[in-house]
Amino acid sequence: NRPFLHFDKNRNTLLVHAGIHPEWTIDESISYASELERLMKGNQCKNVLENMYGNDPIKWSLDLNKYNRYRFFINVFTRMRVLRSANTLDLKYKGTEPSSGENIQPWFESNNQNWNDTTIIFGHWSALGLMIKPQFICLDSGCVWGRSLTAINLDSKFKLTKISHL
């Protein structure tokens, strides 16, 4: 019963588990997350859950059929870290931020002008660790692997709190 993403209009800040696709605007991302949330709360939930696992499709298209469309949404919001050429998903990558010669790039380095000045906060990338860039903040500091939990004060983007024990 949790949203796939949260958008704070007053702060122009979007919070998502893994990321948003570079071919989507902020409004489209919100709309796709809402579509998925409605399905998960409705009578199609069981069918969506039965069809949600898999690494395909890897390329976004408005023509994706319903289960491929939902799987793509789920993979972007919850699993995506890097993209290959033509903004295709690479869901197997688990390393640190790739170097320029690896033929992959972090999803947030797509130079998407559709995101304007929205700050996007995400996790799901403990190998990347805490990362603060002007528009992007990765808060995954590896708590699930026994490292610290990191939190951020949204009123002051650079005021961090690390909690070493839960």
Protein language model regions, located:
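Feature recognizes metal-dependent phosphohydrolase scaffolds
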Residues: 1-166
